[in-house]
Amino acid sequence: MRRAAGARELLDGPVPPADLAATLRDIERLDAWLGGHALSLARVRRAARQVPADRLLRVIDVGGGGGGFARRVARWARRAGRRVEIVLVDRGAGTAALARRACAAYPEIRVISADAATLPLRRGCADVVHAALTLHHLEPETAVAALGEMARVARGRVVVNDLARTRIALGLVWMATRLLAMHAISRHDGPLSVRRSYAPQELAELFRTAGLPRVRVRRYPVLARLVAEAA
């Protein structure tokens, strides 16, 4: 399946606040249904083992949307007795505002509105820099810039979790957006997100071009996911 380069998702344009909120909820439901958050959290937990237990664990979630994954990390850290600081970055001011409200009960989460390609964060400030369902929104040149910024602010791992561009994934996402009675934007954008996603070799090449040559890409066909990780 060829990548749908240049195709535009509705969520990347202006969206009324109520529709935006509904679509972000749909994304979190889809992540729960397909297990995307679990794959990412496993990487955070693995990275945490490399950080002394008495030291603050710092996580950056790039393109963090409504904050579902950030909250999941915070809940895990509380259960594990780990001190954690999570910075959620999203370029949409409306999305960031919704995330702040959704994360209000989590003082360990800070939300900022910024572009992935120009992160307003200092070099080497995070143990894990994570992006889920984000890279497929970007064309290759911008994706490389975003990965370069993620590498700059990471002192540990860079993790990218995105949809697999396969017919199985396309069918799973199409079915999920219908069976779970998702918003019209989600029914449009979900399958298109699959078609816009990068194949494993394409994703690995983006990492290498961004200065992250030691990248490992794992496929999870049943979950419709790819996870790329570099340290």
Label every PLM stretch briefly.
Residues 1-15:
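N-terminal auxiliary segments of SAM/dcSAM-dependent transferases
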Residues 12, 17-43, 47-48:
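Class I SAM-dependent methyltransferase Rossmann-like catalytic core
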Residues 60-62, 66-118:
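Class I SAM-dependent methyltransferase SAM/SAH-binding core
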Residues 130:
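A conserved beta-strand element that flanks and buttresses the S-adenosyl-L-methionine
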Residues 138-149:
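A short, conserved alpha-helix within the catalytic core of class I
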Residues 154-163:
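Conserved beta-strand signature within the Rossmann-like core of class I S-adenosyl-L-methionine
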Residues 163-210:
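C-terminal alpha-helical "lid/dimerization" subdomain adjacent to the S-adenosyl-L-methionine
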Residues 196, 200-231:
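Conserved Class I S-adenosyl-L-methionine
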